[in-house]
Curated annotation (Swiss-Prot):
The gene is serS. Consists of two distinct domains, a catalytic core and a N-terminal extension that is involved in tRNA binding. The keyword Aminoacyl-tRNA synthetase applies. Keywords: Aminoacyl-tRNA synthetase, ATP-binding, Cytoplasm, Ligase, Nucleotide-binding, Protein biosynthesis. L-serine binds at residues 229-231, 283, 383. One of its GO terms (molecular function) is catalytic activity, acting on a protein. It comes from Desulfitobacterium hafniense (strain Y51). GO terms for cellular component: cytoplasm. InterPro entries: aa-tRNA-synt_IIb, aa-tRNA-synth_II, aa-tRNA-synth_II/BPL/LPL, Ser-tRNA-ligase_type_1, Ser-tRNA-synth_1_N, SerRS_1_N_sf, SerRS_core, tRNA-bd_arm. This is Serine--tRNA ligase. Catalyzes the attachment of serine to tRNA(Ser). Is also able to aminoacylate tRNA(Sec) with serine, to form the misacylated tRNA L-seryl-tRNA(Sec), which will be further converted into selenocysteinyl-tRNA(Sec). Belongs to the class-II aminoacyl-tRNA synthetase family. Type-1 seryl-tRNA synthetase subfamily.
């Protein structure tokens, strides 16, 4: 969330950021409450000063044997007024905090300004989409023909947007997880295997709640949520902590299953692995000094790109516009892999710098020196990569005319075969 003091002193900056994001959050009610809060605070402080003066007078009178009963009654009345005003002040501050939780992050100055994804800017491309001398199939058709993906039985067992991986399909998924974790660990990321359930405060800390609760799977009768991404537990590992400067930067990689309701995606990508309720992903999470966080974003993005390059999958990097930026992000690069069945690029990773937005919500701070005042650090994360979408890209880009799928060279040591099928 944003700094309350910043919002109070820079309302026009925040309003402009909300406008660029096409956000429907109104700051007017917040500012009206801020004005009322200031008035109440002044009144409370004035009454407290009066109470202190009366208290001193009561003490003086008692010391000299004078009657102080009327002053004592007056002091009690003042005390009750203070309590009532402080209760009202607490309600207003609670309401203001609720509004703060609804205000998205302020886009970095380098983010392209635009209404939606049409305003996203291509930063670079890598590789050349393959030309086929036959009609390429979609990944779900390939998976079903090779009997390595079973959508029908998963639908019978659970429902839509679930999949059984079978045989070499399951091994391909597992190989990709190991391959990605190995590559990221070799670059200094410390591997974490996180819990798949977190409580409400953790979801609030990374920004999924309260705004996106309809997209989350909640465990009935508990305060637990199934994680939508490893970002949530890994970021919250350091919630309510003050780190020392020598601990930074912290780089983690984490494999997890991810669970998403996809409430706003009815009718979109209903077939295949692109949009599932449950999917696997390797996540990259960073905790950085504020002054270095944009360098960290560039290196994180390159680390995610390196996986696609080793797998020899064509992709492009897109800088998201202000209108397409995620709620918590100050700047995001999307990596989009080429999928022949769509004849276009599709997102396979989002790499974001949240600056201190998540750190404020989760209260993650650091000290530059042993006795220095704690500061909020910057958090970053990115997919490195989404496994199901990587499987989709491999099946489609490496399919052969005879129905087999060639295994990328980088994965052959993990899978032990050159072809699937």
């Amino acid at each position: 969330m944003l700094d309350l003091k910043f919002v109070r002193t820079n309302p026009e900056v925040v309003k402009e950021a909300l406008k660029k994001r096409n956000s429907n959050v109104s700051l007017d009610a917040f500012l009206e409450q801020e004005e009322e809060r200031r008035k109440l605070l002044f009144e409370v402080e004035s009454l407290k000063a009066k109470r202190n003066t009366v208290s001193e007078e009561v003490g003086r009178r008692k010391k000299h044997g004078e009657d102080a009963e009327q002053l004592i009654l007056e002091m009690r009345e003042v005390g009750q007024k203070v309590k009532n005003l402080e209760d009202k002040l607490g309600e207003i501050e609670q309401s203001m905090e609720a509004v703060l939780y609804e205000i998205p992050n302020i886009p970095h100055e380098s983010v392209p300004v635009g209404a939606d994804e049409e305003a996203n800017v291509e930063v670079r491309t890598w590789g050349t989409p393959r030309s086929f001398d036959f009609e390429p199939l979609a990944h779900y058709e390939i998976g079903e023909k090779l009997d390595i993906l079973d959508f029908a039985r998963a639908g019978k067992v659970t429902g839509a947007r679930f999949t059984f991986y079978k045989g070499l399909g399951a091994k391909l998924e597992r190989a990709l997880i190991s391959f990605m974790l190995d590559r990221h660990s070799a670059k200094g990321y410390v591997e974490v295997l996180p819990p798949y359930m977190v409580h409400r405060n953790s979801m609030i800390g990374t920004g999924q709640l309260p705004k996106f609760e309809e997209d989350a799977f909640k465990v009935a009768g508990t305060d637990y949520f199934l994680i939508p991404t490893a970002e949530v537990p890994v970021t919250n590992m350091y919630r309510e902590e003050i780190l020392e400067a020598e601990q930074l930067p912290i780089h983690h990689c984490a494999y997890s299953a991810c669970f998403r309701a996809e409430a706003g995606s009815a009718g979109r990508d209903t077939r295949g692995l692109i949009r599932q309720h449950q999917f696997n992903k390797v996540e990259l999470v960073k905790f950085a000094f504020p002054e270095n966080s944009y360098e960290e974003l560039e290196s994180l993005t390159r680390d995610a790109e390196s996986i696609l390059q080793e797998l020899e999958l064509p992709y492009r990097v897109m800088a998201l516009s202000t209108g397409d930026l995620g709620f918590t992000s100050a700047k995001t690069y999307d990596l989009e892999v080429w999928l022949p069945s769509f004849n276009t690029y599709r997102e396979i990773s989002s790499c974001s710098n949240f600056e201190d937005f998540q750190a404020r919500r989760a209260n993650i701070r650091f000290r530059r020196a042993p006795k220095a005042k704690p500061e909020f650090l910057h958090t970053l994360n990115g997919s490195g990569l989404a496994i199901g979408r990587t499987v989709s890209a491999i099946l489609e880009n490496y399919q052969e005319a005879d129905g087999r799928v060639r295994v990328p060279k980088a994965l052959q040591p993990y899978l032990g075969v050159e072809y699937i099928g």
